[in-house]
Amino acid sequence: MIRILLSNDDGISAPGIQTLASALREFAQVQIVAPDRNRSGASNALTLDSALRITTLSNGDIAVQQGTPTDCVYLGVNALMRPRPDIVVSGINAGPNLGDDVIYSGTVAAAMEGRHLGYPALAVSLNGHQHYDTAAAVTCRLLRALQRKPLRTGKILNINVPDLPLSEIKGIRVTRCGSRHPAEQVFCQQDPRGQDLYWIGPPGEKYDAGPDTDFAAVEQGYVSITPLQVDLTAYTAQEVVESWLANTEVDGEW
């Protein structure tokens, strides 16, 4: 039986992770290690300045108090799940993680930590807040396929599912990340003492949503699978930077 470490960024009681856990437990051994509260947008934050406490629920699920998604996967792999998992799954997120969203996403970060620690990893997001059962069914189908025929790319699979009944899903597309215009909105309010409070506004509008992007696939009713990698090196820019450095006086005598 496949062993799955399951986490998220919406918190342990969120409907997405609970729906997915129920579906996965029909054919897998599942250990939930998830934040005790919503940590959306936490990205790859790792808690290094304080100790982490856990709460083990009656069903064996583990909530990490004030933990980030990355904390949860780190603890799950290195301390809390024994034997260790075969794969790390993050989700189901309430809302998509498309394009530049992956930079901020705690859902993607949890999967990224799993991959960084040497495990196959999936991040699963629903483009809405209704059909979690659809996203769970898609995830189960993919995991069963991975059991039959492992995918040895060393990459994270970022999966985004349209918020539709399963019967209306048109298929699956392998995509690239689209892009958004930079977000610029900030909302300012005042508390009762007259102190300013700031709220970060919505993400920027899409500007690269071409037919091969994750944006386009989900909008057209397809499941989007985007391979992501931990290595952030821009290999195609290395020669450009080398040439620039050779034509400047930066790398001279110190």
Swiss-Prot record:
UniProt-annotated binding residues for a divalent metal cation: 9-10, 40, 93
GO molecular function: 3'-nucleotidase activity; 5'-nucleotidase activity; exopolyphosphatase activity; metal ion binding; nucleotide binding
Signal sequence, renumbered to the chain: none
Predominant location: cytoplasm
Keyword hit for Iron-sulfur: no
Gene Ontology CC, one term: cytoplasm
Keyword annotations from UniProtKB, A to Z: Cytoplasm, Hydrolase, Metal-binding, Nucleotide-binding
Cofactor note as given: Binds 1 divalent metal cation per subunit.
Cofactor field: a divalent metal cation
Any single Pfam family the record assigns to this protein: SurE
EC class (word): hydrolase
EC number(s) given by UniProt: 3.1.3.5, 3.1.3.6, 3.6.1.11
Known catalytic reactions: a ribonucleoside 5'-phosphate + H2O = a ribonucleoside + phosphate; a ribonucleoside 3'-phosphate + H2O = a ribonucleoside + phosphate; [phosphate](n) + H2O = [phosphate](n-1) + phosphate + H(+)
Subcellular location as annotated: Cytoplasm
UniProt-listed InterPro entries: SurE (IPR030048), SurE-like_Pase/nucleotidase (IPR002828), SurE-like_sf (IPR036523)
Stated family: Belongs to the SurE nucleotidase family.
PANTHER family: 5'-NUCLEOTIDASE SURE, 5'_3'-NUCLEOTIDASE SURE
Entry function: Nucleotidase with a broad substrate specificity as it can dephosphorylate various ribo- and deoxyribonucleoside 5'-monophosphates and ribonucleoside 3'-monophosphates with highest affinity to 3'-AMP. Also hydrolyzes polyphosphate (exopolyphosphatase activity) with the preference for short-chain-length substrates (P20-25). Might be involved in the regulation of dNTP and NTP pools, and in the turnover of 3'-mononucleotides produced by numerous intracellular RNases (T1, T2, and F) during the degradation of various RNAs.
Protein name, UniProt field: 5'/3'-nucleotidase SurE
Lineage of origin: Bacteria, Pseudomonadati, Pseudomonadota, Gammaproteobacteria, Enterobacterales
